[in-house]
Design a protein with these regions (language model features):
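Catalytic cores and adjacent flexible loops of soluble metabolic enzymes
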Residues: 1-306
């Protein structure tokens, strides 16, 4: 489909929360209304014992595979599997001890910033750097599932890059590719999307996941958007060269005999562009021609006396 990497989530329901019926642990409203936290995470978890096979397969097909650990035991598992990078989820953005533990691996770290204010984002960055992280990317993120596109606030991307001096990407939970394409134009260097093979196969994140066709489109559209930026410049582009001849120029539109004076009835500014530039029309009027000229002849100074 064109993706550069696959990111998993490494947790179990027991490492995320406790199995409790207390109202604090029950979701009210939204996509997962009525779920207990424990039951939702139980449904969505990727068993630890599956990870080795998935990483082995990713290496076999030569695609980068990494994961989001949600506690220290997940980090330890991923270290044993020699994961090349890590991600911190938005909901763990304030878990500074976990961020420090992940950063201490000295591996590249991607951190989502959903729900975090700027002071919290600064704390995340300081914690990661203080624990040894050298390669850091922050993801602008709206932690709503799905996220409303009109609350994307993508102008945060260049602002965050300017303030913090790190690469910025987008963790996109909207249901279309629009926000991701715009983000790439604004300088996002990484786009994250939830992925599902078939939305008819319902899952915890199916409502805001993209399918293979949509992922292929996303990869092409974001790459094209980035390539379209080019650089600021006013020189003619190679792709335009072939069409120069279809510009307007000055042509004889009436037969004229050698020695006659050109009048405005003899010439017009028309396409194609093989004649003198349109701005020279007034210069031609009142001049004499030095040979017989038929209608449809491009003007040139070689045809003019003096």
């Amino acid at each position: 489909c064109g993706a550069d990497a696959v990111k998993l989530q490494t947790y179990t329901a027991d490492t995320m929360t406790i199995d409790s019926d207390h109202k604090d642990f029950c979701i009210q409203g939204g996509l997962w209304d009525g779920y207990k936290l424990y039951d939702l995470y139980k449904e969505a978890e990727t068993p630890f014992e599956w990870h080795k096979a998935m990483f082995d397969h990713a290496r076999k097909i030569d695609i980068t595979c990494f994961s989001t650990p949600f506690d220290e035991t997940a980090v330890d598992l991923l270290e044993d599997l020699n994961v090349p990078a890590y991600k911190v989820a938005s909901f763990e953005a304030t878990d500074l001890p976990l961020i420090a533990y992940i950063a201490s691996t000295k591996k590249p770290l991607i951190m989502s910033t959903g729900m975090a204010n700027f002071e919290e984002i600064e704390e995340m960055v300081e914690t990661a750097r203080g624990a040894g992280c050298k390669d850091l990317i922050l993801l602008h993120c709206i932690s709503s599932y799905p996220a409303p596109v009109d609350q994307s606030n993508l102008l945060t991307i260049p602002d965050m890059r300017k303030r913090l001096g790190v690469q910025i990407g987008l963790s996109d939970h909207t249901v279309t590719n629009t926000a991701s394409v715009v983000a790439s134009v604004l300088g996002a260097t990484l786009i994250e999307k939830h992925f599902i093979l078939d939305r008819n196969e319902k899952g915890p994140d199916s409502e805001f996941s993209i399918n293979p066709v949509e992922l292929t489109s996303l990869c092409k559209e974001t790459k094209d958007a980035w390539l379209s930026l080019g650089c600021a410049g006013y020189e003619r582009k190679p792709a335009e060269e072939a069409n120069i001849k279809f510009r307007r120029s000055v042509y004889f539109v009436k037969d004229i005999s050698a020695g006659d004076v050109i009048t405005k009835e003899h010439v017009r500014r028309i396409r194609p562009g093989y004649g003198l530039p349109p701005k020279m029309e007034k210069e031609l009027i009142g001049r004499k021609v030095n040979k017989n000229i038929v209608v449809g002849t491009a003007t040139s100074w070689e045809l003019i006396d003096g």
